[in-house]
């Protein structure tokens, strides 16, 4: 990015994050912008996202992911106050996992994807951005095992809700929540949820600069 464009993008990012209740420090803003540059660079070769315009990346990727961060952070810190852990399923180019890891350095973020080139990108992001609280895993989430479990398991563009809970639900810590990021309210998907799962809440998100519907669907095991 040219210096003027970079300054404008930084100002827009800072204002957007503040509107979302995320007063980020300078180093966090720098890391988010560096992540966007990495995403655009790798995208030219590996096709990580269909969005290529820098302005659209800011709203559709960075701010869209950051909009979910306050709620995800609140939930996981409540469930795991000592060592908060979030699993991002089908993370792709690191959304929402990388923005979450940058905004919340106290939260451990694991990102899983079945496409090796995407997890290679996530590994590169961890190294270049110095994200010691983030890690990536290449493979199928249903084959993962974890003795502790994750306080929050999230996904942004992974699958329908029934597949989300079926494939990843075994990794949830006691008292944990599954948080799906969706566009329009997914009533049809909710109706297809399998037995043993219940919708705790459906929360509408407002993303600065993005005039589109966004919802968080928060799921919990039912008694």
From Swiss-Prot:
Signal peptide: none annotated. The keyword Methyltransferase applies. It is an enzyme of class 2 (transferase). Its main location: cytoplasm. It catalyses: guanosine(527) in 16S rRNA + S-adenosyl-L-methionine = N(7)-methylguanosine(527) in 16S rRNA + S-adenosyl-L-homocysteine. S-adenosyl-L-methionine binds at residues 90, 95, 141-142, 156. GO terms for molecular function: rRNA (guanine-N7-)-methyltransferase activity. Keywords: Cytoplasm, Methyltransferase, rRNA processing, S-adenosyl-L-methionine, Transferase. GO terms for cellular component: cytosol. InterPro entries: rRNA_ssu_MeTfrase_G, SAM-dependent_MTases_sf. It is found in: Cytoplasm. Its EC number is 2.1.1.170. Specifically methylates the N7 position of guanine in position 527 of 16S rRNA. Belongs to the methyltransferase superfamily. RNA methyltransferase RsmG family. This is Ribosomal RNA small subunit methyltransferase G. It comes from Ralstonia nicotianae (strain ATCC BAA-1114 / GMI1000) (Ralstonia solanacearum). The gene is rsmG.
């Amino acid at each position: 990015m040219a210096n003027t464009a970079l300054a404008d993008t930084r100002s827009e990012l800072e204002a957007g994050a503040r509107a979302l209740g995320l007063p980020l420090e300078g180093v966090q803003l720098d890391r988010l912008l560096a992540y966007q540059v990495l995403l655009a660079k790798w995208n030219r070769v590996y096709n990580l996202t269909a969005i290529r315009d820098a302005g659209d990346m800011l709203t559709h990727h960075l701010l869209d992911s950051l909009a979910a961060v306050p709620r995800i952070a609140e939930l996981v810190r409540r469930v795991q106050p000592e060592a908060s852990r979030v699993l991002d399923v089908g993370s792709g180019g690191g959304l929402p996992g990388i923005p979450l890891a940058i905004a919340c350095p106290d939260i451990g973020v694991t990102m899983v994807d079945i496409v090796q080139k995407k997890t290679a990108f996530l590994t590169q992001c961890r190294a270049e951005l110095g994200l010691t609280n983030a890690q990536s895993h290449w493979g199928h989430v249903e084959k993962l095992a974890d003795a502790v479990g994750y306080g929050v398991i999230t996904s942004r563009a992974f699958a329908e809700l029934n597949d989300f809970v079926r494939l990843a639900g075994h990794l949830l810590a006691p008292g944990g929540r599954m948080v799906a990021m969706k566009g329009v309210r997914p009533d049809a998907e909710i109706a297809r949820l399998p037995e043993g799962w219940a919708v705790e809440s459906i929360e509408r998100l407002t993303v600065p600069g993005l005039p589109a519907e966004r919802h968080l669907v928060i799921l919990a095991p039912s008694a």
